[in-house]
Amino acid sequence: MLDKHGREINYLRVSVTDRCNLRCVYCMPPEGIIKKEHDNIMRYEEIFKVVKSASLLGVNKIRFTGGEPLILKNIDKLIYNTSKISSIKDIAMTTNAILLEDMVEELKKAGLKRVNISLDSLKEDRFKSITRGGDINKVFKSIEKSLSIGMRPIKINTVIMKGINDDEIDDFMNLTKEYPISVRFIELMPIGEGRRLYKDGYISSEEIISKHSDLIPVETEKSSTALLYKFKESKENIGFISPMSCKFCSGCNRVRLTSEGTLKPCLHSEKEVNLKNYVGNNQALLSKINETIYNKPLEHHMIEEKESKSKKMMYQIGG
């Protein structure tokens, strides 16, 4: 369906849980999070109701996120049921891949089309530091397994932070020459724990691109959040997601469902609607989703204000 600004909204990002088995420095506090009561989070059946209703309004792309979506007990069942909605054309997931190796084959059979893997360092000790305890070898094994079963595309999402991992930019780029893997560099955002790191850690996409004259621009869809490039030798693209230096609001085609059941029309807006109050009434749920999509804000003002208006952490909204 169209919002009031004429944009086609066909993409729903679903945070199935705010819990995670890592505690990345820009996402979660060191002590982790307080576990929510069961009644305060969406059950898998409720999530599916929202997905089904959204599909009736023209949503045909679903991405499951977290927290870490693979710790949700029924994630395979949720993917399978979503795949049976005839109008849903694409089911994707963003994961840290710690648990992916043992699950990816069944998830692919259930209907998962592609994965984005959050990976902010290729160095074992640094990865452990950024994630506060993660085992990078589990991620590497998950990538290898995903490639071996034909999962395509596989994209690596990397948040670049000055003085932390910016010396690995070339190493990440070179992955696209060696493997059929896309890499997405994401600008650090002043949201949640990222506010602490932003002043000293922010690097613009343009700064990175300007240092790589051999990058070749690739045509990008209007709704894409990434500007795409590749090397002559690349097997896949290199993308730059630049919410702080080049916002993509005019082509935005997405809304977000949080693990608490709130529908956010914009990542960086305070505006949200609690759909848990409506999941028992199909018509009311459909109407509330329709209303929220229609009233999606024209744009965010994070570039001008250097801060997101959203008071939620990224693990609550979905990465």
From Swiss-Prot:
**Chain sites annotated for binding [4Fe-4S] cluster 1:** 20, 24, 27
> Which keywords label this protein?
4Fe-4S, GTP-binding, Iron, Iron-sulfur, Lyase, Metal-binding, Molybdenum cofactor biosynthesis, Nucleotide-binding, S-adenosyl-L-methionine
Query: Record's Pfam families?
Result: Fer4_12 (PF13353), Mob_synth_C (PF06463), Radical_SAM (PF04055)
Keyword Iron (UniProt): yes
Q: Which cofactor does it need?
A: [4Fe-4S] cluster
Is Repressor tagged as a keyword? no
EC number(s) reported in the record: 4.1.99.22
Pathway(s) where this gene product acts: Cofactor biosynthesis; molybdopterin biosynthesis
- What is the cofactor note? Binds 2 [4Fe-4S] clusters. Binds 1 [4Fe-4S] cluster coordinated with 3 cysteines and an exchangeable S-adenosyl-L-methionine and 1 [4Fe-4S] cluster coordinated with 3 cysteines and the GTP-derived substrate.
The regions listed as transmembrane in this protein's record are none
List each copy of the Radical SAM core domain by range.
4-227
Q: Name one GO molecular function term.
A: S-adenosyl-L-methionine binding
Summarize where GTP binds, as residue positions.
13, 63, 94, 155, 254-256
Any GO BP annotation: Mo-molybdopterin cofactor biosynthetic process
Q: For S-adenosyl-L-methionine, which residues are the binding ones?
A: 26, 67, 118, 189
Q: Which reaction does it catalyse?
A: GTP + AH2 + S-adenosyl-L-methionine = (8S)-3',8-cyclo-7,8-dihydroguanosine 5'-triphosphate + 5'-deoxyadenosine + L-methionine + A + H(+)
Instruction: Please tell me where [4Fe-4S] cluster 2 binds in this chain.
Output: 249, 252, 266
Q: Which PANTHER family match?
A: MOLYBDENUM COFACTOR BIOSYNTHESIS PROTEIN 1, MOLYBDOPTERIN COFACTOR SYNTHESIS PROTEIN A
Q: Which HAMAP family match?
A: MoaA_B
Q: Which NCBIfam families does the UniProt record give? A: moaA, PRK00164.2-1
Q: What quaternary arrangement does the UniProt entry report?
A: Monomer and homodimer.
Q: What does this protein do?
A: Catalyzes the cyclization of GTP to (8S)-3',8-cyclo-7,8-dihydroguanosine 5'-triphosphate.
Family in the record: Belongs to the radical SAM superfamily. MoaA family.
Question: Any idea what this protein is called?
Answer: GTP 3',8-cyclase
Please give the organism. Clostridium botulinum (strain 657 / Type Ba4)
Gene designation per UniProt: moaA
